[in-house]
């Protein structure tokens, strides 16, 4: 069962993604910020990370750069945002993100 780490500061987004992914048979971990994501990443490498771009304290792009610089970007990361620009999405893929999902994220978009 693939382990997916969902990192988003919005509780509603975390809960929605948790329900969709769990119902599809995935092992889902939730993190509300970069600090919690770091701890989850240290506890064990997920098979996939869904990472919000805009979060308080440390944003998703900064965390992605950190993982890349530390040699910890050895799992696919899909960035998520409802406010990101094309430039932000391009920057994320240059750093190493696999893809970009625009919020709101529905079941079809997530599982497609």
Q: What positions do the PLM features span?
A:
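C-terminal output helix
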Residues: 87, 104-112
């Amino acid at each position: 069962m693939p382990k997916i780490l969902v990192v988003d500061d919005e509780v509603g987004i975390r809960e929605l993604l948790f329900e969709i992914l769990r119902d599809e048979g995935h092992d889902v971990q939730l993190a509300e910020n970069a600090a919690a994501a770091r701890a989850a990443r240290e506890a064990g490498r997920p098979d996939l990370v869904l990472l919000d771009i805009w979060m308080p304290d440390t944003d998703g792009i900064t965390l992605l750069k950190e993982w890349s610089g530390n040699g910890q970007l050895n799992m696919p990361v899909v960035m998520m945002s409802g406010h990101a620009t094309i430039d932000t999405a391009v920057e994320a893929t240059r750093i190493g993100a696999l893809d970009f999902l625009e919020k709101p994220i529905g079941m079809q978009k997530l599982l497609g």
